[in-house]
């Protein structure tokens, strides 16, 4: 298994992706597929959030390609290991090696779970399971109605049992459960928390803010989503 992992890294030039792959369409992608890292939970782990209900896969692939999305996912996992985890570890003075993921599933129905959206989610899930299986601490699925719960077995069947055991479905009153694990001021307003990231163009999911990037902001060419940062020299970048 480990040899397969090493061969994959060599074949895909993974070490180069982390520093050399420019995903310049990221801001357009986030409009169609809202997602991002945002602060930490009470254990000091990075929070990763997706508004999965807003994902339009057809529209997504008008601004990027599946191949580039795969490279982007791999790059972000590498940055999680080499940049975000070390920043979080330094902040809490102990090793942080897992993240907490939140997926907002509001409005997802049968067509989402059996069509293009499911294929896209499965693509992302396979990357995580095959090459970065230990990085997920917990995952919380928000706004899971009765239909979603009924169809959960379909999605779960594609997942590793160990990974599936880390996933918890919450209904519409999820905030009372989330605040057990995350300070409310670290939860974005878009999922009923108190953080607005008003200094970030686009809001919380454009911030990538946390101990690894205290000022927040995503650099794309000469543009930074932090309204107070003007150039690439101003932003904290992954090493």
Predicted regions and their residues:
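Basic, amphipathic alpha-helical/coil surface patches used to engage anionic, phosphate-bearing ligands
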Residues: 1-239
């Amino acid at each position: 298994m480990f040899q397969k992992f090493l061969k994959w890294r060599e074949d895909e030039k993974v070490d180069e992706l982390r520093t050399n792959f420019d995903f310049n369409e990221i801001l357009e992608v986030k409009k169609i597929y809202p997602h991002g890292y945002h602060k930490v939970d009470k254990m000091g782990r990075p929070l990763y959030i997706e508004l999965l209900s807003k994902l339009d896969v057809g529209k997504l692939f008008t601004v990027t390609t599946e191949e580039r999305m795969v490279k982007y996912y791999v790059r972000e996992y590498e940055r999680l290991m080499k940049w975000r985890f070390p920043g979080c570890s330094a902040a809490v003075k102990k090793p942080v090696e897992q993240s907490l993921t939140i997926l907002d599933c509001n409005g997802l129905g049968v067509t989402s779970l059996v069509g293009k959206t499911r294929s896209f989610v499965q693509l992302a899930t396979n990357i995580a399971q095959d090459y970065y299986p230990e990085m997920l601490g917990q995952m919380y699925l928000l706004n899971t109605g009765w239909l979603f719960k009924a169809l959960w077995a379909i999605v779960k069947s594609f997942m590793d049992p160990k990974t599936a055991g880390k996933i918890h479905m919450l209904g519409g009153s999820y905030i009372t459960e989330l605040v057990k694990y995350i300070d409310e001021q670290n939860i974005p307003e878009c999922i009923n928390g108190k953080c607005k990231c008003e200094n970030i163009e686009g809001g919380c999911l454009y911030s990538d803010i946390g101990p690894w990037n205290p000022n927040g902001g995503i650099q794309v060419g000469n543009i930074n989503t932090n309204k107070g940062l003007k150039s690439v020299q101003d932003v904290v970048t992954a090493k």
